[in-house]
Amino acid sequence: MKTELELKPVRAALVCVSAMIMLVCGALSAQTARQSKRPTHQQATARARQLVARMTLDEKFAQVHGIKDATHFRFVPGLPRLAIPELRVTNGPAGAGPGGAGSQKPATAWPAPIALAASWDPELARTYGHLAADETRSLGSNLLESPDINIARVPQGGRVFESYGEDPYLVSRLAVANIEGIQSTGIIANVKHYVANNQETDRGSINEVIDERTLREIYMPAFEASVKEAHVASLMCAYPRVNGFYDCESKLLLGDVIRKEWDFDGFITSDFGAVHSTIASVLAGLDLELPTGIYFNGALRKAVDSGEVPIAAIDEILVRRYAKMMEFGWFGAQPRQRPIPVLEHGAAARSFAAQSMVLLKNEGSLLPLDRDRIQSVALLGPYALHAATGGGGSSHVIPLYSVAPYDGVDAALLSQTKLTVLDGSDVAAAVDAARKAKIAIVMVGDDEREGTDHGIELPPGQNALIAAVAKANPKTIVVLKTGSAVLMPWLQDVPAVLEAWYPGEEDGNAVADVLFGKVNPSGKLPITFPRALEDTLAANPDQYPGDGKTVRYSEGLNVGYRAYVSRGVAPLFAFGYGLSYATFQFSDLKVTPKGGRGGATVSFYVSNIAKLTGAEVAQVYLRFPPIAAGNEPPLQLKGFCKVTLKAGERRVVKLELDKRAFSYWSGEAHGWQTAPGTFHVMVGDSSENTPLSADRTVQ
């Protein structure tokens, strides 16, 4: 299957995503014909001011916090007297999950966001956002709490599965596309959790000590891009304290950075229970307390009556939200509940999941499986019987339906093939079934959830099951369904490993599509998989999880793959890594300066030397020259491109790196500065494998 072919040059160059540059081709427009008729921000703001001037004090105070009822967990009621519509909020990183006091309507359970990140495909992220927003409207809401763009600082984080991974550049590109997809439907995106919501342990009170440069270069870029590029309409402030101040009452984070520096004109909501004050939160720039009013209720009225909070501040809070709702067409219209197109969205979920799976190991080209040559299969393990539809907590979605793994595998096999399915609880029975089968497939996984961090070991018994089955059958395939990285003590004993993440409601079909070659895997890891717990920040309790009061981000810029390279520690699987059933080569790198003070055009060939079509993610990294700021990471992702190539095809890939790609945050200048010196440009298929390199000197 990997026989080399004569390469067929293709003249047209593929221009892809790179530093602060949008994908050139195939982008969905963020403006529909209907949206073009909506008021501009200036017009909406003027109308909102007129509206607020007509409100009574009681009406104003009732509009700055949420309430909940028997069917909806958080919403702001409308004011019929003034034709002010309801704001109905839906959780959303993994699909429309309205939540509620005892009720939640089903929706499409999409693959987990970490799976979406593994696709390394902004266009897929855009479509994902569009479809999730479409269901938000179908379920009667107008704000979708999505995406979650916190950096996966530690693999133990309980919400890594909700995130887009460990690299700020990758997260930024996916965030912008996802938000544009959401807001193209008229649904308000609510990007979260600002900022540095990186662990669940002590999340409500922990003080994170983060230096300014690290905050700006690692934890803020995706939020900055969401505001400046995607023009996100709303933002959620997070639980932790950053350098002594709670996020939701930090004048620096909310007022100075978001509103003044980034020119954010939307509204800011709190995470649930993340408000700790009345006066400080209002004056910092918080607009809406959710889910209900504790500090923005009677306490706020007292603060206004005493003169500690001017009524003008309350007026501005309302103007900001009403203006955005007007811009998005919600004044004069309410979302109408309508049926979700189950089959259409299910097909999309299946495709998304398959494109996100990462082939970690494939010795002897065991995969893809040829159903014509398989007489028997043993499908084993706790995740063989039910679909891994998602993680737990607020992002949980009740699926419209689910496809069990055994159903997906059974449908992919010939009718005469014997399929034995066991959950693995009886290891002896599983071993016996594996010994008698031609192929053994072991499906294992974890259950990440909001509110608690976790270890990076598989749950008890799963490693032992894999080891026992592998000993009984040399053709054992392990399928992981995890929300983050896990240790693999059995890795050397199995020929094939597929990371499927939480595939969503189409689990069984999507996994079978990859195992049997209907889909050629093209996913790449958005997080690093460590060899041992000691290789993570957990080796230093001050860095993670902290002492219960403080956690120190003393690793600075060396987060994720940067830390492994800087310390000379080999990961189990590197950031950006992922195999294919095809084989690719990189060649002919050219780096052309673009402007005297930073910027470059990076071009190279990607060739498919296999006999089948496949997709490769070309990745561009920079190594900065030594600068006054010091402690430069050994490499930083600055561009990537997912390119699909037919057998024997090669294409020129061009990526435009702008000045920002060559810049660092200067605390002294309080801004971005271009680093003078020689930058090392590296191109390859992972952070660990960059066969092409060249230099770019900046004066």
Task: Describe these PLM feature segments.
Residues 15-25:
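Bacterial N-terminal signal peptides
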Residues 2-17:
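Bacterial N-terminal signal peptides that target proteins for export
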Residues 30-665, 671-673, 678-688, 696:
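Glycoside hydrolase catalytic-domain context in secreted enzymes
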Residues 2-3, 28, 32:
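Intrinsic low-complexity/disordered segments
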